[in-house]
Amino acid sequence: MKDVKGTAMSSDLRVVKLSENIGARVDGVRLGELDAETAAAINQTLAQHKVLFFRGQDHLDDESHFAFAESLGVPTTPHPTLKFEGSRVMRLESFAGGGANQWHTDVTFVDRIPKASILRAVELPSYGGSTTWASTVAAYQQLPEPLQQLADGLWAMHNNAFDYAQMDIDPAKLAALQANPDAVLKYAAEFHSAHFETHHPVVRVHPETGERSLLLGNFVKRILGVNSSESQALFRIFQDRITWLENTIRWNWELGDVAMWDNRATQHYAVSDYGSQPRRMHRITLAGDIPVSVRGEQSRVISGDATEYSVIDSPTARVA
């Protein structure tokens, strides 16, 4: 494997760094079931670059996609509440405006936040439909020391009480949505079929790198220990730092593309700029650990049991 400047690491892989704070393209690998050396190299590269992109993986189907995921960790079930009968992957399909067009880290309303997500393009619109990722590690590192110290002691409530009526829907999709709202209503009902609430530290320690990162996103309902207006102000200070353009990378999808991101160190946003065209993506997530604060305290479950969704996969955390 060759890193940014061509240093040999493992097999024929080559890593091309795409921006200063986040993102790399990995060439020279056919995804599927991997040997241990290649899998370890990809996991190591993921921890370094936060999000990896693989081109030319047209051969992948759900089975080989799952085999690739198994090479890198322990796959979760598709989702804690959404049902995908007979499938081990989560099918993300546009439904006249539905989509993850808000900044978020995947599934933070449970205690065992996934380690990583692996997303594959299945059907793409003729224009638009890109995805943007942001480094929550870079965001923390850029904070002035007084704000780092403040964030280090804060906790936030995350839950899945997401208001689908407030989705930011492209006006081009409104007519289709109004004509057939059943898809959104069914999706929302499934999403809310079980209530999950977890208290997470605003700053978590990465269990492999020891880096500190901001754990926020659209599943945060409030910062604990302060009033509503203070919570909103604190959230905006830290969330806005995450989404500075210098901390982001935007990927324009092609068929055959696969993206893999470290869910412990990133947020992402699926850009809803493709009108009423179809967009289908398949995702598999890998089991992760329970976040740990800079003081060594684990996240706390308030409501919901995620044991059927995922095991806990906990490498030993260390404080940076």
Can you say where each PLM-predicted feature lies in the sequence?
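Fe(II)/2-oxoglutarate oxygenase catalytic core
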Residues: K2-M260, R264-A320
